[in-house]
Amino acid sequence: MTTETRQKRIGIFDSGIGGLTVLRELYRQLPKESILYFADTARLPYGTRTTEEILQFVDEIITWLVKSGVKMVLMACNTSSALALEKVKSKFDVPILGLIVPGANTAVKQGKRIGVIATPATAASNAYRYAILEANASVQVWQVGCPYFVPLIEQNQLHDPYTYQIAEEYLMPLIQQQIDTLVYGCTHYPYLEPILRSLLPKSVIFVDPAVSLVKVVARELKIMNLENDKTPKPTKFVVSSSPQKFADLSLQLLGYKPDVQVISLPAMLK
């Protein structure tokens, strides 16, 4: 691969700030890589959308990312990974990676009674259940769809008593099943970790698929000779609406306030 190709950005997308958990992992594990982050804030949350809507959104976003010159695309959104990855990855000329298989492979190394909290769309797809049982058919899996988590996080209500109450309600079935491992089936959910840890037994192991995905990214970049060995470019942030709100939330979650551009999909594709 040419130096120019290796210096291209990795494209990441999510419906909102959830994918920043993947971005943080990229900064930690692959600090030399340049990133283009897209948040489809005009159409969030994805977790209550239909499969057809998700497929349309994902197709538009990846088309735009590829036109923007990325060398790889990361679906930093479990709903997209669950419903669209297999359908779109052969359509584009860049590698497209999702969260679910890396997360499932890590989960089965941790425990035998695995709970998955996810958006309703991800839970209904059974993508994590299938991936976990494919990795190890002897484990047990329980999934809970959590429709209110993403809106609460995007509205910056992490410390609201109502959020704690909702978390308690969602976790109750998993506590009753005595899970030993909890998988974040949505990239937004690591922001809830203090609340979730306070509700679950201390012995429960938390699995963040973002960590597992970035390990896979590192391996793929090496295999494909796409690792950047030059100084990385500053991360570019693009949203489909509410740039100020996104920047303010990013300050809390990343520790710095990014410059955020706004584009309108699908208008940008014409």
Curated annotation (Swiss-Prot):
InterPro entries (UniProt xref): Asp/Glu/hydantoin_racemase, Asp/Glu_race, Asp/Glu_racemase_AS_2, Glu_race
Domain of life of the source: Bacteria
Keyword Transport recorded: no
Gene Ontology biological process terms from the UniProt entry: cell wall organization; peptidoglycan biosynthetic process; regulation of cell shape
Any Pfam family the entry gives: Asp_Glu_race
Function as written in the Swiss-Prot or TrEMBL entry: Provides the (R)-glutamate required for cell wall biosynthesis.
Protein name as catalogued: Glutamate racemase
Organism whose genome encodes this protein: Trichodesmium erythraeum (strain IMS101)
